[in-house]
C-alpha cells in the first residue's frame, strides 16, 4: 500500500510558524535533488528547472543529486548532463543504489572530485538503444542518429573517466556492470562515501 510522499515541518525565513511541506520540496530548499526513477522528459525538465533556479538563487552553494535509477531517455540524460555543467554551482552526484545507462552518464557528469557512490552501489554503462519501426528510410535515419549519439556519449565518458575512447566503446557494447570500487577505479566516480559528512 503506497504511503505517499511524507510531509515534514519547514519554517521559511521570516515566518514564526513552520509549514508542513512534502519531503522533496523540503530537500529541494536544501539544494538536494533526486534522480530515482526512469529519466523521462518530465523528470529531466524538473531537474533542469530546479538546477537553473538554485543556480540563479546562489551560485556559490553546491547542489546535490542523489541517483538510484535504471536510466532512461538518452536525450534527457544528455540534457541533464549539459545543465549540470552549464550552471556555476558545483554539482555533487551521489549513487545510492543503482546508476544504470543514462543515470550513470548523469553520475559521471558531476563536478570532478564530487562524484560519489555508496559502498554497495551498482553502476552500469552500455550503448544507447533505438526503437524505430516503419519505413526503411525512417529506420535508417534513426539508426544513424543513435550511432552519432553513441559516439558523442562515448567521447564524454572518455573525457570524464580518463579511459581511452577505444575502451569505452568496447565496454559500451554490452551491459558493463561495476561495483562502487570498480566504478572508482574506472573513473566514473571519485569517492566511495561511507557517511554523509564525506
Curated annotation (Swiss-Prot):
Catalytic activity: Hydrolysis of proteins to small peptides in the presence of ATP and magnesium. alpha-casein is the usual test substrate. In the absence of ATP, only oligopeptides shorter than five residues are hydrolyzed (such as succinyl-Leu-Tyr-|-NHMec, and Leu-Tyr-Leu-|-Tyr-Trp, in which cleavage of the -Tyr-|-Leu- and -Tyr-|-Trp bonds also occurs)
Chief location bin: plastid
A GO-annotated cellular component: endopeptidase Clp complex
CDD domains: S14_ClpP_2
EC code: 3.4.21.92
A Pfam family it matches: CLP_protease
Keywords, comma-separated and alphabetical: Chloroplast, Hydrolase, Plastid, Protease, Serine protease
Gene Ontology BP annotations: protein quality control for misfolded or incompletely synthesized proteins
Protein name: ATP-dependent Clp protease proteolytic subunit
Species name: Tupiella akineta
Top-level taxonomy: Eukaryota, Viridiplantae, Chlorophyta, Ulvophyceae, OUU clade
